[in-house]
From Swiss-Prot:
Changing D68E: Severely impairs prenylation activity. It comes from Bacillus spizizenii (Bacillus subtilis subsp. spizizenii). It comes from the Bacteria. Keywords: Cell membrane, Competence, Magnesium, Membrane, Metal-binding, Prenyltransferase, Transferase. Mg(2+) 2 binds at D67, D71. Belongs to the FPP/GGPP synthase family. This is Tryptophan prenyltransferase ComQ.
Amino acid sequence: MKEIVHEKIQNLDLKEYLINFIDEKNHFSFGILSFKHYVALSGNRSSHILTLAGGIELLILAFDIFDDLEDEDNIEIKWMKIDPSLALNAATTLYTLGLETICSISNSAEFHRLTLKYALNAMQGQHEDLRNSPETEEECIQMMKQKAGSLTAMSAVLAAMLANGEFNQTIEDYAYKIGIIKQLENDYYGLVNDQRSDIRKKRKTLIYLFLNRKFNEASEKILKLINSHTSYHSFISDSSKFDELLFEAGLNQYVSMLIKLYEEEITASMNQLNINIKL
């Protein structure tokens, strides 16, 4: 990622910001997902997949910055500590660099079309999230599929196309589910992270919609705490007590069941294609 920035960016001040932001990354799960698919499908040009993975991770970093700026999240991270206009310009630069890098790997019009489709769909999913639009669990899952699933689909599908030159619908379908799992895990983490704005802004995540069905007293208690920002953050400081309440509400079981269901569907689809990837 840094090599791409050093090669493409001449403005030294902007370059320094981008390198510092890249240093903030501590996971590269989207690039790894691409790499695993490329290897599983017998791709043999390491320079191609490394370039793809780097381009995708630049794009993911851009989306992370956009997301934090829009949600006012993670206030201790580097891009949230500078002038928002500079952070926004840096994110736009990373977004453009990511797309340019990805599209430079292949001359295929279909490869380019899919790259832009997934990026555009992810932004539309983010718009629905910012609008707090979902009213039902089905609508929320569709939003998660667009917002997060589009990026996991990009990672897996483009790697497969690099390996064998073909678009595979089955890979796209299960890759969307990988993204839904990632988003669900992220939303669950948002329950206990006081750096996140999910609670303060009452985001209609799948978790919130489940609680809002008020199956039991524990669900209602959590909702009341959510409506009292100070009480909520005081309560979650006692993690064992909060975990117990989540369990009583049935939330832990609900999230675990959904993840297990999607994982089983993903594994079944991979087995059909003789793809052996550990997620």
